[in-house]
From Swiss-Prot:
Segments traversing the membrane: none
Stretch list, region Disordered: 107-157
Protein name per Swiss-Prot or TrEMBL: Protein FAM181B
Species in which this protein is naturally found: Bos taurus (Bovine)
Gene, per the UniProt record: FAM181B
Pfam families: TEADIR3
Highest taxon of source: Eukaryota
Family the UniProt entry places it in: Belongs to the FAM181 family.
Length: 419
């Protein structure tokens, strides 16, 4: 009956099955919808009286839940459809920042624009005077002349700042001895230093490198290149107020200067000359009472052996057991170990190993570390043996060789007798 009601009726909630004929079901559902949604304004008959065989409370509750669900779902769908998409506008941050910097620098370095011809260089300075002489000053015009006066004062302050900057960073034009400082102020205007545009270069040629002045071309004060003195940081020390690094290399002050650098610039060329002559104390002087005799100290604090050439160990690999020429140990003042201590042999060597042989002495010195590996007896130095080769040998696989020297391997292998 619910399927027939869904097919015949046009109401969307008919498939949720209410009894009765399709026409009566539609009318009853309409009355029920009015009853559940407009309970305060309900004036007709109640919905329970129109439905035959159905309980009014359950139907009203189910309809209310269904309508609230559809309402929330439709609102969510509408919000999702009306949500604006991601903006695809791309912002060029570099151009934006350049515009902002240009605007701010234009506000900070506000100066009168440069004249069109070199002969009219003094026109901005004469303009306020001419305006004051020719034009009468009525009351409304006086209110308009106040911003002009402020602009002229700002221009004068900017020109003063440009003179001070030109005296410090004068790399655009080298003024000869007879030139007046007014030409310097014209060559390096304030707008050219702050903004660097072509409109600011008044009375001088436009230089492309005017924005970034190299350090060597700036007229920096002498104190910028002065070395700080050693005596308490005051300029009255031995270095003097105008002494640079080049002056320190001359005369007797060079020795005093290099004495500050410590043993790094010593006269020795060996690596051992860079080490201090005094023994290095691991513990501070206050903890010397807690130390025991040197022979009872652990080996953790033993100093590293001295460098001999570029090798850490003086014995060459070809003669590990040979006697090495060693210097006698220098006696330490405090009885401790020094950095010039003679090297103790790391690997125990055989006493009768020859000095020029390559194999036996070296293998014998490594035998305590590989005690589980039994090495075959070493051959004479003149004879070349194949027992150490990577292939099969008679010593290692003696059971595969017959007394006549034939190979007893599987049939078909190389060296085996063919059947």
């Amino acid at each position: 009956m619910a399927v027939q009601a869904a097919l015949l009726s046009t109401h969307p909630f008919v498939p949720f099955g209410f009894g009765g004929s399709p026409d009566g079901l539609g009318g009853a559902f309409g009355a029920l919808e009015k009853g559940c949604c407009f309970e305060d304004e309900e004036t007709g008959t109640p919905a329970g009286a129109l439905l035959a065989g159905a309980e009014s409370g359950d139907a009203r509750e189910a309809t209310r839940d269904l309508l609230s669900f559809i309402d929330s779902a439709s609102s969510n769908i509408k919000l999702a459809l009306d949500k604006p998409g991601k903006s695809k506008r791309k912002v060029n941050h570099r151009k934006y920042l350049q515009k902002q910097i240009k605007r701010c620098s234009g506000l900070m370095g506000a100066a009168p624009p440069g004249p069109s011809s070199p002969g009219a260089a003094d026109t901005p300075a004469k303009r306020p005077l001419a305006g004051a002489q020719t034009v009468p000053v009525p009351v409304p015009a006086h209110g308009k002349a106040a911003p002009r006066r402020e602009a002229s004062q700002a221009a004068a302050a900017a020109s003063l700042q440009s003179r001070s900057l030109a005296a410090l960073f004068d790399s655009l034009r080298h003024v000869p001895g007879g030139a007046d400082p007014a030409g310097v102020a014209e060559a390096v205007p304030a707008a050219g230093l702050v903004r660097g545009d072509a409109a600011g270069s008044a009375g001088g040629p436009a230089v492309p490198g005017a924005r970034k002045v190299p350090l060597r071309a700036r007229n920096l004060p002498p104190s910028f290149f002065t070395e700080p003195s050693r005596a308490g940081g005051c300029v009255c020390g031995p270095s003097g107020p105008g002494v640079s690094l080049g002056d320190l290399e001359k005369g007797s002050e060079a020795a005093e200067f290099f004495e500050l650098l410590g043993p790094d610039y010593g006269a020795g060329t060996e690596a051992g000359a860079l080490l201090a002559a005094e023994p290095l104390d691991v513990f501070p002087a206050g903890a010397a009472v807690l130390r025991g005799p040197p022979e009872l100290e652990p080996g953790l604090f033993d100093p590293q052996p001295a460098m001999v050439g570029s090798l850490l160990y003086p014995e060459p690999w070809s003669a590990p057991g040979g006697p090495a020429t060693k210097k006698p140990p220098l006696p330490a003042p405090g009885g401790g170990l020094t950095l010039n201590e003679p090297l103790r042999s790391v690997y125990p060597a055989a006493a009768d190993s020859p000095g020029g042989d390559d194999g036996p002495g070296l293998l014998a010195s490594f035998t305590p570390f590989f005690s589980d590996c039994a090495l075959p007896p070493a051959p004479p130095p003149q004879q070349v043996s194949y027992d150490y080769s990577a292939g099969y040998s008679r010593t290692a696989f003696a059971g595969l060789w017959r007394p006549d020297g034939a190979w007893e391997g599987a049939p078909g292998e190389e060296g085996a007798p063919r059947d």
